[in-house]
Amino acid sequence: MQQALFGGGCFWCVEAVFLQIRGVEKVTSGYAGGHTTHPTYEQVCQGDTQHAEVVLIDFDEQQVTYSQLLDVFFATHDPTTLNRQGNDIGTQYRSVIYYFNEEQKQAAEHTIQTLKDDDLDIVTELSPTPTFYPAEDYHQNYYEKNPSQGYCNFAIPPKLLKLHSKFQHLMKN
């Protein structure tokens, strides 16, 4: 089992996307990249902790590769807006990839360079994996538990439509 750690805006949205991918065994919403130990959602939302909302993805590399997860990540959020995804503004919503090893770093660098070669101004941060703090229980599997919640109903379906149209071959049955 391998792990990936991505931040691409609200973790509810990112989690909802990656739970659809075959080979993804678990997605845990949480916080990483800041200076506060064991931050709360409220602290992260205030913007003082410097943590990003992230998802820790446990995946079977025999079913889905890290590079494929990177492709999904970049296609389902906007990696060209600094500290912002749609109406969500703040450093906690930054686009970030935390890598666990040199192979992940190289794969991310390659993907970012490919996007830059296509004239995209990528602002995604690439850093070694810091301490990951799981978010509170009510944030886990949030969209699955709250599909009609206003924010989820607005923000997540377009991401899932894009996922289904571009990555059908990676979807769970």
Swiss-Prot record:
GO terms for biological process, alphabetical: protein modification process
Taxonomic superkingdom: Bacteria
Keyword presence, Oxidoreductase: yes
Record: active site: 10
Keyword Disulfide bond: no
Catalytic activity: L-methionyl-[protein] + [thioredoxin]-disulfide + H2O = L-methionyl-(S)-S-oxide-[protein] + [thioredoxin]-dithiol; [thioredoxin]-disulfide + L-methionine + H2O = L-methionine (S)-S-oxide + [thioredoxin]-dithiol
Sample GO molecular function, one term: peptide-methionine (S)-S-oxide reductase activity
EC number of the protein: 1.8.4.11
Record's keyword terms, sorted: Oxidoreductase
InterPro entries assigned: Met_Sox_Rdtase_MsrA_dom, Met_Sox_Rdtase_MsrA_sf
Summary of the function given for this chain in its UniProt record: Has an important function as a repair enzyme for proteins that have been inactivated by oxidation. Catalyzes the reversible oxidation-reduction of methionine sulfoxide in proteins to methionine.
Matches recorded under NCBIfam families: msrA
Family named by the database record: Belongs to the MsrA Met sulfoxide reductase family.
Protein name as it appears in the record: Peptide methionine sulfoxide reductase MsrA
Organism the protein comes from: Acinetobacter baumannii (strain ATCC 17978 / DSM 105126 / CIP 53.77 / LMG 1025 / NCDC KC755 / 5377)
Gene: msrA
